[in-house]
Structure formats: C-alpha cells, structure tokens
Amino acid sequence: MPASPLRLGVNVDHVATLRNARGGRNPDPVRAALLAIEAGADGITAHLREDRRHIRDEDMARLKAEISKPLNFEMAATDDMMRISLATRPHAVCLVPERRQEVTTEGGLDVVGQHNALAPYIARLNDAGIRVSLFIAADPAQIEMAARLRAPVIEIHTGAWCDAVVDGHTEKADAEWKRIVAGAKLAKDAGLEVHAGHGLDYATAETIAALPDIMELNIGYYMIGEALFVGLAETVRSMRAAMDRGRSRA
C-alpha cells in the first residue's frame, strides 16, 4: 500500500524578519503565504514569539483571515499566547520552547519535565477544537509523555540531524537519523500523528519524506533564503518535488 501523501507547511517567519529589519510593511509575510499556497504549499506556519521579533499579532490575524489553507500557529505555552490563539482560532497550535536569548528555537519542549504546566494548555486547545502539536526531540520518554497528555500530534525537531548532515559529521548524522526513524515509529504506534521540521533543505527533506510514519514537514528558513535567488514560487515547487521523490520510496 502506498504511503499517505506528505504535506508541506511553509513557515513565513523570516519574511517578517526581513520586513522588521527596515520597518514598514514590506516584504509582507501574508503575501508570501498566499504565493506559497498558490505554488503548492498545503499549509502555512508562523511563530508569534513573546518578543515579536518577526511575526506580529496583526500578521496572525491577517493570515487567519486571508489564507485558504490551514494555519499552524507556533507559540510558547503562556497565558498571553493562549489568549491570542483562542481569539485567532487557527487550524493548529504547535507548542514550542522559547528563550529570548536564542536566535532560533534551539531544542524541543521538555514535555517530561513540564508536563504539569503543559497539561492545561493542551486541554484548553483540545476543548476549543484546535489541533495541538508538541515540538519535541525524537526521544522515547518525551514521545510517551506527549501521548499521555493527549496531544494528538508531535513535531520531531530535526535540527541536530540536519546540522550534522550539512557539516559532514557522518557518524552523528547517522545516530540522529536512527533516533528520528525510531521516534516516528514509536509515536505512530502510540496513536500520534507525526510531523517534522527545523533545518530541512531540499536534500534532507527528500530523505525524511521516505519515512511513511511522517505526515507533514514544516520548513521555513531555508526556503526563504533560497527564494532570494530563484523566487518563492519556484522554491515551493522544488521543495514539493523533492518531497514527492522521497515519498515515492516510502
């Protein structure tokens, strides 16, 4: 039986990073989202950070109002973000760790250590009909706790694997890859839907697309950088093609 289709979520955070570097309204992350969808994206991801360093509150409202595909709202588990997410009512919320000092999300949520704090946020989002995902490492204890907390989805943090691949650290890349493969299977067997993201490029997206347990990839920084050279629509089409090549081997 062929594997289920693999969805592509395009993260538009770094369109907003470019805009905010100069101020004003351009480039517009909502326009980027619309172009990405037209070119074949299955959904849009945006991370509203507490310091508003890229995506702003009004961007989230406009994305929800203007795009025709599912909106995945990445956020820290705080009361302020909960209020905004319940007002925005995106298709999905992905709970992520967040530190003001970090340049990008540096690791996965510690679901094991923070399960008591996370549980009420997961329950409220579930009750509101918003699909909840937890951004975690491919660690058995974290995956098992995610299932116990009744989060229907996990997103596996692929950053360590992608960095090792790019840096040519073959042994580390192989070890991280084995963790991802095992983690995706464990999560699927536990009844979780499995997504993946962070640091993916054409090559690593094609590789991970061959894992039938993974249903969605969320990719942003690489695609926005590549779009500077070939355009966003072409980048989305090329990423979609890379994913499809990988999926054909699942």
From Swiss-Prot:
1-deoxy-D-xylulose 5-phosphate binds at residues 13-14, 49, 54, 104. It is an enzyme of class 2 (transferase). Pathway: Cofactor biosynthesis; pyridoxine 5'-phosphate biosynthesis; pyridoxine 5'-phosphate from D-erythrose 4-phosphate: step 5/5. The active site is at residues 47, 74, 198. One of its GO terms (cellular component) is cytosol. Gene3D superfamilies: Aldolase class I. It catalyses: 3-amino-2-oxopropyl phosphate + 1-deoxy-D-xylulose 5-phosphate = pyridoxine 5'-phosphate + phosphate + 2 H2O + H(+). Transmembrane segments: none annotated. Pfam families: PdxJ. Its main location: cytoplasm. Its EC number is 2.6.99.2. It is found in: Cytoplasm. 3-amino-2-oxopropyl phosphate binds at residues 11, 22, 199, 220-221. GO terms for molecular function: pyridoxine 5'-phosphate synthase activity. Catalyzes the complicated ring closure reaction between the two acyclic compounds 1-deoxy-D-xylulose-5-phosphate (DXP) and 3-amino-2-oxopropyl phosphate (1-amino-acetone-3-phosphate or AAP) to form pyridoxine 5'-phosphate (PNP) and inorganic phosphate. Homooctamer; tetramer of dimers. Belongs to the PNP synthase family. NCBIfam families: pdxJ (TIGR00559), PRK05265.1-2 (NF003624), PRK05265.1-3 (NF003625), PRK05265.1-5 (NF003627). This is Pyridoxine 5'-phosphate synthase.
